[in-house]
Swiss-Prot record:
Residues 17-105 form the Rhodanese domain. Gene3D superfamilies: Rhodanese-like domain. SMART domains: RHOD (SM00450). Its main location: cytoplasm. The active site is at C65 (cysteine persulfide intermediate). It comes from Vibrio vulnificus (strain YJ016). The gene is glpE. This is Thiosulfate sulfurtransferase GlpE. InterPro entries: GlpE_sulfurtransferase, Rhodanese-like_dom, Rhodanese-like_dom_sf, Thiosulf_sulfurTrfase. The keyword Iron does not apply. The keyword Translocase does not apply. It is found in: Cytoplasm. It comes from the Bacteria. Transmembrane segments: none annotated.
Length: 106
């Protein structure tokens, strides 16, 4: 069975900046609304079908949560759905924010 990979926030930012990957955030709606990584798609049970229709299965997908734990399960789920290159962002949004990477806030 295929497995997801791990990526640090700097590597994730580099892929996103070059337009080579799609970032999804699986945190709760309130946390996402307060602040999220720039250009992140809020992936929920309600938005997964829409996401799967919009994104090519060959396009790398980066999964972000709070601290890099929950994202691993979601990343494996996306692999199981047929996405070919899926990464769990180590450290999650907390590490992204600590690294002063681009954030969209309300």
């Amino acid at each position: 069975m295929e497995q997801f990979k791990h990526i640090d926030v700097q590597g994730a930012h580099a892929l996103i900046s070059r337009g080579e990957a799609r970032l999804v955030d699986i945190r709760d709606p309130q946390s996402f609304a307060v602040a999220h990584a720039q250009s992140a798609f809020h992936l929920t049970n309600d938005s997964i079908v829409n996401f799967m229709q919009q994104v090519e299965f060959e396009q790398p997908v980066l999964v972000m949560c709070y601290h890099g734990i929950s994202s691993q399960g979601a990343a494996q789920y996306l692999v199981n759905q047929g996405f070919e290159e899926v990464y769990s962002v180590d450290g999650g949004f907390e590490a992204w924010h600590r690294a002063s990477l681009p954030v969209e806030a309300s």
